[in-house]
């Protein structure tokens, strides 16, 4: 009976996420086309690389977010709501501290990097500065809302997650149409639009959690062990996040240093395509991950392993079905979608799709590993190999 209810819940949540995916993918791809046409290739490339600077510092958030999601879902699986409130409150405080740390480094090291290392035309440096400031604001707002997002996902309220995501992309589409008719610096205006959308998204997240989940009411506990538990777990996950940074934004920075902004534009478009196609498999991943952690918390190891195996096969198949025709007809797809696009966009897209196929096989095993809490050895190994 328990398995049937879990499978039914996963199926329902997956359906909601596919509805979200369909709407978000169509709107996002169309929005990207309008943004590229409105900003132009050079400004689009500047936006991509400048916004990427802040990512050099947010790998810390990736580690802490993973810890927050794991511990919230784990305690919810055990149905220990007192401990759940303690974990949520400690996680919120930790994310506030992290946001302040990132703000310090972003405004010091990041600003220096912007003016001294990136290849940006001198007449666009002022615009690049404001894009960077907006990227910092958007990132910090995203960091402090992580505990609320983790709580929604742990409760498996995928409908709310879907509605908020659709709201996000539709609002951006409305704003980009507005952008086309304004006589302002379009690059700067688009950066401020990102901040505005993030503020609204965070507000809705907070209101929903505060109304439906009592454990989201912040209480300040003096139990140092709570904060230590989250930070210790995050520290080992930090090693893995560092390797991801080296692969992702490190590549972006190197491309800019050795080439020019049009290459960053090509990679930025490829990353947009990756974000769209990965949703075909990640919807099932998002729906299944909370169940994997909860099953481990309850000691249902055999059921957890069955879920991991079945989910891995289905995720790879869903992604492969979509990725294969895209790879075979990449030139045609880019022509229909963008019209004019930067050189090397095809090559970047094919490489990124291949990487996504590999990741779809291992993602559930990573979730199970995080559920156990024993992540020290694996992250050290990955960090040494990739970095």
What are these regions (language model features)?
Residues 4, 112-134, 327-359:
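Interfacial segments at transmembrane-helix termini and the short loops linking adjacent helices
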Residues 137-167, 188, 209, 353-384:
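Membrane-interface junctions at transmembrane-helix termini in multi-pass inner-membrane proteins
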Residues 62-78, 154, 213-214, 270, ...:
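Helix-loop junctions and terminal segments of transmembrane helices
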Residues 20, 133, 162-211, 233, ...:
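Hydrophobic alpha-helical transmembrane segments
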Residues 45-61, 90-93, 200, 235-238, ...:
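Alpha-helical transmembrane segments of polytopic membrane transporters and translocases
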Residues 9-74, 103-107, 172-173, 232-262, ...:
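Signature of the first transmembrane helix
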Residues 12-24, 62-115, 126-136, 302-323, ...:
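Membrane-water interface segments that mark the loop-to-transmembrane alpha-helix transition
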């Amino acid at each position: 009976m328990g398995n049937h209810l879990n499978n039914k819940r996963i199926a329902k949540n997956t359906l909601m996420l596919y509805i979200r995916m369909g709407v978000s993918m169509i709107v996002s791809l169309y929005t990207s086309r309008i943004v590229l046409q409105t900003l132009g290739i050079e400004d689009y490339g500047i936006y991509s690389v400048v916004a990427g600077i802040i990512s050099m510092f947010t790998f810390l958030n990736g580690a802490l977010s993973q810890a927050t999601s794991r511990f919230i879902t784990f305690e919810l699986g055990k149905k220990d709501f007192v401990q759940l409130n303690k974990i949520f409150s400690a996680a919120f405080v930790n994310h506030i501290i992290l946001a302040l740390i990132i703000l310090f480094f972003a405004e010091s090291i990041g600003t220096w990097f912007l003016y001294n290392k990136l290849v940006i035309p001198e007449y666009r440096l002022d615009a690049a500065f404001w894009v960077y400031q907006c990227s910092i604001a958007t990132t910090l707002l995203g960091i402090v809302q992580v505990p609320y997002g983790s709580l929604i996902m742990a409760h498996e309220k995928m409908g709310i997650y879907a509605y908020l995501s659709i709201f996000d992309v539709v609002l951006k589409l409305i704003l980009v149409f507005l952008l086309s008719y304004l006589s302002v610096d379009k690059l700067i205006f688009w950066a401020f639009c990102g901040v505005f959308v993030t503020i609204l998204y965070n507000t809705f997240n907070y209101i929903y959690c505060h109304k439906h989940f009592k454990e989201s009411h912040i209480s300040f506990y003096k139990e140092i062990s709570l904060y230590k538990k989250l930070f210790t777990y995050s520290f080992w996950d930090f090693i893995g996040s560092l390797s991801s940074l080296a692969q992702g934004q490190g590549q972006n920075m190197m491309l800019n240093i050795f080439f020019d902004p049009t290459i960053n534009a090509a990679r930025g478009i490829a990353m947009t395509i990756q974000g769209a196609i990965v949703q075909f498999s990640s919807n099932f991943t998002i729906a299944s991950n909370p169940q994997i952690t909860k099953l481990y918390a309850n000691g249902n190891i055999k059921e957890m392993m069955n879920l991991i195996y079945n989910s891995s096969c289905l995720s790879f198949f869903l992604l492969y079905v979509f990725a294969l025709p895209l790879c075979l007809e990449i030139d045609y797809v880019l022509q229909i979608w963008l019209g004019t696009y930067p050189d090397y966009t095809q090559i970047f897209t094919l490489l990124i799709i291949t990487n996504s196929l590999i990741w779809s096989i291992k993602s559930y095993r990573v979730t199970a590993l995080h559920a156990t809490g024993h992540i020290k050895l694996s992250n050290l190994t990955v960090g040494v190999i990739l970095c």
